[in-house]
Amino acid sequence: MLKKILLLALLPAIAFAEELPAPVKAIEKQGITIIKTFDAPGGMKGYLGKYQDMGVTIYLTPDGKHAISGYMYNEKGENLSNTLIEKEIYAPAGREMWQRMEQSHWLLDGKKDAPVIVYVFADPFCPYCKQFWQQARPWVDSGKVQLRTLLVGVIKPESPATAAAILASKDPAKTWQEYEASGGKLKLNVPANVSTEQMKVLSDNEKLMDDLGANVTPAIYYMSKENTLQQAVGLPDQKTLNIIMGNK
């Protein structure tokens, strides 16, 4: 599951215009930012907000004199609050992060019209990145999945220069594939100093990776069938791998 803290940070800091009832205002003073209202069961009025790294729901009783902060469940045991938070907060923010990845500097591995898209943040010296690259071969080679790799230089001091060498090659995507296929043994023309252009790409990728809440590679992102952004950090197990590759 994608870390929520970064998604909440994407929400616009817009002051809630409607005058809040006194009980809700008292809860708001505890550091909660009210985002919108919604109709809640039982004649109550709901308020959707955020607090630190969490989405929160507040329920105002029909008499307007009491407010409850927390989850609401129905008779089937379904968490109505969490469903609302996912739909109204996390899902839209996740789609925005997906768009940021689409607009970033990535290397294509596979057919550009492959139906399943998977983004991967990878370091040239990351052994698990190489294993994931190998794991993905059946899906990529069959045209079912396209991997979009965002190179970063975070593991070793020589990582940035090695990543820059790949980016500066005649065909970066092909060079990256050959590098991973060789287990990192492909000879590269590693520069003594990373150019400003390549450093910007790496810095932008690392910033995006950080904004997504990941601090290790591979950091893998894909969309679920519900069109919500999902995250898998590290080498995925077989069950997770199947989900990532669209075998739901």
From Swiss-Prot:
Signal peptide residues on this chain, from the entry's feature table: 1-17
Q: List the disulfide bonds.
A: C126-C129
Keyword presence, Disulfide bond: yes
Record carries keyword Transcription regulation: no
Q: Name one GO cellular component term.
A: periplasmic space
Q: Which UniProt keywords apply?
A: Chaperone, Disulfide bond, Periplasm, Redox-active center, Signal
Compartment annotation: Periplasm
Q: Which coarse location class describes where this protein primarily resides?
A: periplasm
**CDD domains for this protein:** DsbA_DsbC_DsbG
Top-level division of the source organism's lineage? Bacteria
Question: What is one Pfam family matched by this protein?
Answer: DsbC_N
The protein's role, per its UniProt record: Involved in disulfide bond formation. Functions probably as a disulfide isomerase with a narrower substrate specificity than DsbC. DsbG is maintained in a reduced state by DsbD. In vitro, displays chaperone activity in both redox states.
Q: How does it assemble?
A: Homodimer.
Which family, according to UniProt? Belongs to the thioredoxin family. DsbC subfamily.
- In Swiss-Prot or TrEMBL terms, this protein is called Thiol:disulfide interchange protein DsbG
Organism, as annotated: Escherichia coli O157:H7
